[in-house]
Amino acid sequence: MSCVAELVFFSGTMDCGKSTLALQMDHNHGARGRVGLIFTKMDRAGTNVLSSRLGLSTGALEVGDDLDFWDAIVGRATAGTRIDYLICDEAQFYTSDQVEQLARIVDEMDVDVFAFGITADFRTELFPGSKRLIELADRVQVLQVEALCWCGRRATTNARVMDGVMVVEGEQVVVGDTQPGTTGLVEYEVLCRRHYMRRMTSHAAKAAALSPEVLPFDLDVCPLPPLPITQAD
């Protein structure tokens, strides 16, 4: 473990294990006698909780837009609370000012900050928090657990889906269900770039496969065999 505190941003799409890694890192550091605080914002399981899709969860401090990380951590340290590291989940939702406060905590208080978040929104535009983390972090680590598109390719984008139809307009932050097929709700689905650009969700792919008016496969994935060349007499 480095003797110099770092600001590290662990990034990836949905389903790549960010929150699971956050929980594991807290466990590992705690097992070595280090003391930390866990922060999160708008976790799908509710407020004041950090949860993963594997069913693991733990209590956390909820981050509001008005939270000043610097004041909060300095206040605890002044009161005698030992703090060696911070776990900051759903960091894409933090404000740019809050990310700058986290960087200051690393530099001036020698406290490690491990931030976890999605890089880009459903429009493939950077979240403000993620953008500032990329700009300021000592290290940016793309998680190696690959989320998969419905076609089996590596997923690189987060699509917003309403009633099976992918949308590319609307508020940047809308918390929704993450299990495809929940009608009447906003949901999210990870897609490869090709199917994001085509707006081809798993729901749309199934509909296309059942339609007699379209070929039931992707010609780019399963190209038709070339026509035989006939010799002139």
Language model features by range: what are they?
Residues 28, 104-105:
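Alpha-helical scaffold elements within enzyme catalytic domains, especially in hydrolases
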Residues 145-181:
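Short recognition patches in nucleic-acid-associated and regulatory proteins
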Residues 91-102, 122-127:
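Conserved ATPase-coupling elements of RecA-like P-loop NTPase cores
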Residues 7-9, 35-37, 84-87, 112-114:
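Residue-level preference for the first positions of well-ordered beta-strands
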Residues 137:
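Short basic (Lys/Arg) and small-residue
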Residues 2-77, 121-132, 145, 173-178, ...:
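Conserved P-loop
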Residues 89-91, 117:
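Walker B catalytic acidic pair
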Residues 106-129:
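Sensor-1/coupling segment of RecA-like P-loop NTPase cores
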